[in-house]
């Protein structure tokens, strides 16, 4: 037909623990219509469009504009748009690259509407329509039937929706030929998901001070600790740390809950690092796994959507709030903790015990000797 195509995909950025190599040239490196990310993560977007067939001035392009609309929980990073042109659909045979300083396109942001418009300027359209670098001795001209790839990034914020209610992002391509009085449009979208946990801390005898209980949360899949900030009684993930000491210490609220939102679908370990005096600290970390699977189809883009499920210590749990939150309960029992085997404390207990036994034996022998003398 000679008309353009439009495909938009997303991935979690490599530096935000994305499951990809971070390639800037491989269009299949982790990109898909769906992705999972944590709050504070950077997500990479790419828009790929096959340009229409151009054979004359009449069939040349007079308009080629993208309007990208983010949901409330995702914000464009801004000033990072790059456009590349390729001879092939696989984006391996590059023709040229434009950045925002090239003058070939203009970018405009509307923060209130959370949109970004990318419009080809006159010089950009002129190059697309008339460049002589691709075709010789052909009826085609310019970048006819070539592939345009646009890349940019955004950040997942605390406003992101959790669970199977995703955070969609739609792009609309508006284009027109010089010999037409009407515009044509194409649409595509992709979806970002994020999740959370709700830890209920209890004492078996209903005693204990909840404020003395402390936890650390480790992402086992990415081998990092969670950093979060608290707002209105809820912790929102905002980053990660390599060292445990740099991670957030999670403390239950007055009702015993620790709610952490903005976690991607990964495996986690929840470790209790402190509890109230007179109670036994949890011996093992609680193992939490959040998984996703394809379920349903987007009415706009036709992509398979995701649904979440979870396990706690290997057992299936029913997620709440539309598969958004993993619920779990942690109980401390009265008692006291012995130092760990092989530690300094064990040696002190051993030496102390031997000393006490020696003293007792000495007292018994001394007592018997004293009675004998009498």
What are these regions (language model features)?
Residues 1-374:
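Solvent-exposed loop/turn and edge beta-strand elements of beta-rich ligand-binding domains
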């Amino acid at each position: 037909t000679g008309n353009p195509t439009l495909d938009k995909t997303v991935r979690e950025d490599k530096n935000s623990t994305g499951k990809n190599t971070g390639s800037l040239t491989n269009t299949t490196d982790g990109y898909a219509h769906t992705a999972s990310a944590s709050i504070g993560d950077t997500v990479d977007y790419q828009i790929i469009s096959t340009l229409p067939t151009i054979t004359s001035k009449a069939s040349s392009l007079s308009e080629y504009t993208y309007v990208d609309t983010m949901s409330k929980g995702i914000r464009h990073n801004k000033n990072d748009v790059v456009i590349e042109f390729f001879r092939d659909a696989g984006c391996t045979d590059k023709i040229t690259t434009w950045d925002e300083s090239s003058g070939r396109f203009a970018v405009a942001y509307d923060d209130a509407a959370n949109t970004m418009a990318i419009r080809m300027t006159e010089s950009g359209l002129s190059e697309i329509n008339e460049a002589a670098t691709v075709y010789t001795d052909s009826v085609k001209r310019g970048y006819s039937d070539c592939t345009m790839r646009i890349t940019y990034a955004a950040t997942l914020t605390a406003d992101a929706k959790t669970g199977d209610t995703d955070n969609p992002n739609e792009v609309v391509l508006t284009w027109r030929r010089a010999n037409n009085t009407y515009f044509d449009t194409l649409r595509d979208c992709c979806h970002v998901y994020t999740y959370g946990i709700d830890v209920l801390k209890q004492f078996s005898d209903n005693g204990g001070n909840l404020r003395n209980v402390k936890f650390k949360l480790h992402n086992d899949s990415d081998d990092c600790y969670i950093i979060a900030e608290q707002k209105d009684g809820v912790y929102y993930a905002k980053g990660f740390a390599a060292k445990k000491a740099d991670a957030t210490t999670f403390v239950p609220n007055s009702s015993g809950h620790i709610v952490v939102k903005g976690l991607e679908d990964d495996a986690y370990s929840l470790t209790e690092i402190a509890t109230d005096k007179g109670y036994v600290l949890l011996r093992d970390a609680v193992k939490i796994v959040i998984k996703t699977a394809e379920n349903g189809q987007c009415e706009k883009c036709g992509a398979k959507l995701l649904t979440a499920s979870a396990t706690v210590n290997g057992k299936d749990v029913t997620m709440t709030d539309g598969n958004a939150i993993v619920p779990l309960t942690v109980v401390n029992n009265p008692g006291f903790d012995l130092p760990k085997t092989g530690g300094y404390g064990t040696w002190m207990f051993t030496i102390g015990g031997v000393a006490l036994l020696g003293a007792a034996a000495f007292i018994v022998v001394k007592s018997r000797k004293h009675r004998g003398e009498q």
